[in-house]
A protein has these predicted regions:
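N-terminal small/polar loop signature for handling phosphorylated ligands or for N-terminal nucleophile
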Residues: 20, 74, 82-153, 247-313
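Phosphate-binding and adjacent anionic-ligand microenvironments
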Residues: 298-300, 313, 337-557
Length: 557
């Protein structure tokens, strides 16, 4: 990974986004559905792109919105639709476009009061609360967000009635319908003028902020945080929760300071990320330089990304915690301090999250539920109240209410961040100190990731590998215990391969946007063993790709 010389430094003026030009491109540029990259494509968290690249333009939003209206009608979803936005420049225009289509279809849309920005967890919370106890007239939602992506990006995320990110069956349906509309030059898309849509009897206002904030004590022990008198620093990174934090401080009498309350679609206040781009990633030490500088001024400092579904934790003892480390600490704390949680509640993790989570879960006597990358895989289990905590290595997590009922079914950066304050208050030590104690008992993992070139054909082979195509008996001097291409928790394809030994593992997956594959690795045997795992992993994967290519050639003759 080549680190930019700008990484960790304030963004130079020449790097800042030309917002008027981006908005003009959103309306003026027309995507070509014959160009693969310009089609609608739902990844692990919705459709994302930039208006400059003709990958996120008004035509995309019109087509996706029409497709969602048809999906709702086909699947008898006729309750309100909760519609939120983050602070990216394209989010408000996309919201306006979507409303024109939704209102034309007579969908009851719940916009935020005062056109407030709306964190993803506030939308998920609204859907879950509305649908509780209902079997008909169910609500769903849309959030306009590209998550922590650079300022020029836009994103469109659909949350069905379970309140979480849509699964592949849903997104495939919407994607196919939307692309058909693009191919037909939007013929069949219903829309009405924006002012008419705002005045429509089906357009309503919803107080997302207070509905969410007033319910927070049901998921985090904020009374303990207040009683401990902790000093908490918060950097919203210019994101959708910027006005939520002062309300949280006031409502729960917490000594909480927002270190930067600026909202600016150029995100000029950010320090540059590792690759020389502006990115609002709370798990990146380069993007988090400002808050890391406040480490000794607060008992705990926290941040969230642009739609506030991801978290970053800065401790006096450890600085910025790696996301895997904090997930393990959160699980260790929650399952010991939630007496109303049922004994059969499981822990959810993705296949590339740390095996320390497995060890903590085993120590607690809980069941592990391991799924492919993507938080959407947890939504149904959270909705049914079967998963107590769910986390992914990219700093996303949520968990049940203190009474064991569903809180959100999508990632919640606010709750995860406040949990760090609860841990500090109730354990008498910050999450970094808890992690140090945990690893003294269970072992300290070393984590890493490398990338290797892969052609589109090789990426396709990697995503469809079978365990039998992966050859080898040992990895870094240890016997291989398992080779999987499907997740143990739900038997869904992981889109690659994971190989595990007693003290280490690697997982290889193709990139969705570049001609590379990524190898994630971990070792409880130290950095040297991790380096061996990553090196041998590339050899194993390259051999499997060659075998897969040979098999493909044989079958095509």
């Amino acid at each position: 990974m080549n680190i930019s010389p700008l990484a960790g430094h304030p963004a130079p003026a020449g790097m800042l986004l030309d917002v008027p030009a981006l908005i003009a491109a959103y309306y003026d540029e027309v995507p070509d559905p014959a160009a693969r990259l310009e089609r609608v494509s739902f990844g692990t968290s919705g459709h994302r792109g930039s208006a400059f690249d003709r990958t996120f333009n008004e035509h995309h939003v019109l087509a996706i919105s029409e497709a969602i209206c048809r999906y709702r009608r086909t699947h008898s979803i006729d309750g309100p639709l909760f519609l939120g936005i983050d602070t990216h420049a394209l989010s408000a225009p996309a919201c306006a476009t979507a409303l024109e289509v939704l209102a034309a279809h007579g969908v009851n849309v719940m916009l935020a009061e005062h056109d407030e920005y709306t964190p993803t967890p506030a939308v998920s919370h609204a859907i879950v609360c509305y649908n509780r106890g209902r079997i008909t007239g169910l609500a769903d939602g849309i959030v306009m967000t590209p998550s922590h992506n650079p300022p020029a990006d836009g994103g469109f995320k659909y949350n069905p009635p379970n309140g979480g990110g849509a699964d592949t069956a849903v997104t495939s349906w919407i994607e196919a319908s939307a692309n058909e509309l693009l191919e037909r030059k939007l013929q069949g898309v219903q829309r009405i003028p924006h002012e008419q849509a705002l005045r429509a009897p089906t357009t309503h206002r919803h107080d997302y902020l207070n509905a969410y904030v007033d319910d927070l004590a049901s998921v985090v022990d904020l009374e303990a945080v207040s009683a401990a008198g902790l000093r908490i620093g918060v950097d919203p990174l210019g994101g959708a929760g910027v006005h939520y934090w002062p309300r949280i401080a006031e409502r729960y009498r917490i000594d909480l300071t927002v270190v930067n309350d600026a909202v600016d679609p150029t995100f000029r206040f950010m320090t540059v990320d590792w690759d020389g781009r502006i990115r609002m990633d709370p798990s990146s030490r380069y993007a988090m330089q400002r808050l890391i500088g406040f480490k000794d001024d607060f008992d705990i400092a926290v941040a969230c990304d642009t739609d506030h579904d991801r978290h970053g934790i800065v401790c006096r003892s450890a600085g910025l915690m790696p996301s895997n480390d904090y997930l393990a600490v959160s699980i260790h704390h929650l399952f010991r301090h939630r007496p109303e949680w049922r004994a059969e509640l499981a822990v959810g993790k993705t296949v590339v999250s740390s095996a320390l989570i497995d060890r903590v879960t085993g120590k607690l006597g809980r069941r592990l539920y391991e799924v492919p990358v993507g938080f959407k895989w947890f939504a149904d289990g959270l909705a049914r109240g079967e998963l107590g905590f769910c986390g992914e290595e990219s700093a996303g997590a949520t968990f049940l209410r203190r009474n064991g009922e569903t809180w959100t079914t999508d990632k919640d950066g606010i709750a995860a961040a406040l949990l760090a304050a609860e841990i500090t208050a109730r354990e008498g030590r910050d999450p970094g100190e808890v992690y140090a104690a945990l690893t003294r008992e269970l072992g300290r993992p070393a984590n890493g990731r490398v990338e290797a070139h892969a052609s589109p054909a090789q990426k396709k082979i990697l995503s469809a590998l079978s365990p039998e195509q992966v050859k080898g008996d040992s990895l870094a001097g240890e016997k291989i215990q398992s080779i999987i291409t499907r997740a143990p928790g739900n038997d869904a394809p992981i889109g690659g391969v994971k190989v595990s030994t007693e003290t280490g593992w690697f997982a290889a997956r193709p990139s969705g946007t570049e001609d590379i594959y990524k190898i994630y690795g971990e070792s409880f045997g130290g950095r040297e063993q991790l380096d061996r795992i990553l090196a041998e992993a590339q050899t194993i994967v390259d051999a499997a790709l060659a075998l897969g290519a040979h098999a493909h050639e044989g079958s095509s003759r």
